[in-house]
Amino acid sequence: GGAFSGIVNLTNSTFALTADNAAALASATLKLSANNVTTVGTTDRTIQGLDLSGGTLIFDGAAPQSQATGVVSVTDLALNSGTISVTGTDSWNNDTPVVAPNLSILAQDRGDIMLALINAGTVTGDAGALNLMINGTSVNSGSQAVLSTVTQGGVTVANATHNYGLTSSDGNGGTGLYVNYSLSALELLTDGSNALLLATESGATANRELNARLSGIGGVQVDAINGALTLANGNNSYSGTTTVNAGTLILGADGAFGQTSLLNVLSGASTNINGHSQTVGAL
C-alpha cells in the first residue's frame, strides 16, 4: 500500500505508472535510473517524489495541447539525467472554437506555450540535464524543428513546424517539468474554401499577431471578428489567396502577405496596409 516511504530505484526495466502502482508510491520516491523505461499513460497520477537519474519517462501529448494527457503530480522532483519522451499524434485539427486543453494557431505562435508534464512542489537539478524526444525525434532545446500536419474539416491544409525545449518553470509561478514550444512556420497546402483558417480569439490576453512564416502554394482565410489580425512576418512567401471573411487584417511588415495571388476582402471586412508595402496578384 501507500505506507511505504522509501525509494523505489528502477534499473534495466520497464514500468507503468498505473493507478495501483501510483497508490503504492503515494508516500515514496520513484527513482528512474539507467535503462529503465517508465510510461505515464493517459491518466493523471500523484506520487510523493520523482527522481530522474538516467531512465526514460514517456508521456502522451503533443502540440497543440497545453498539458499531457496524463500529468504527474509530486511533492519533490529531482532533474538529474535521463530522457523525457513525448509521444502523441503528428497530425492535429485546426478547430474553431478551440476546445481545451488544445491551443489555437495564434496561441501556439506566442513563443511561451507550456505543455505541462509534471507538477511539483519543489524542484532540484536542471531541466537542461535531460534529453527531450518528440515523437521519436531527438530535440536540441530551441533549435530542432519538429514537423506535424494540420487538418481542417477532414482535409490536410498545412504542414506545421514547432520548436521545443524543456523548462522547470511555467512562467506563472508554477514549478515542475514543462515542454515549452512555439509555432515557427506553416506550409500552406490548400486554397479557396479549404484554405487554412486563422481566427482571432476574445480576451484581453489573446494573441492576434502571427509571426510564424507562411509559405507554400495554399492560402489563408481570416476571421478577425474577435479583434484585428496582424500578419507580421515579412519573409512570408505563400502564393495562394488571402481571404478576409470578417474583421480587419493588418499588414504588419512589408510583404507579409507573401506572394498572394488574390487579396479578397468580403463585404463588411477590411484590410489595413498600416504604412507598409505589399504586392498582390489581384484585388
Residues covered by each model-derived region:
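Disulfide-bonded cysteine-rich modules in secreted/extracellular proteins
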Residues: S184-A199
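Extracellular, surface-exposed repeat/solenoid domains
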Residues: T42-T175
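Short, structured interface segments
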Residues: G174-S182
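A residue-level signal for beta-strand positions that form part of recognition/binding surfaces
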Residues: G176, A195, N207, G219
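Surface-exposed loop/turn positions within long extracellular repeat scaffolds
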Residues: G1-D76, W92-A107, G128, A185, ...
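Residue-level marker of positions within ordered structural domains that often coincide
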Residues: G82, S184, G219
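Primary detection of the long, small/polar-rich alpha-helical "axial" segments characteristic
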Residues: V220-I225
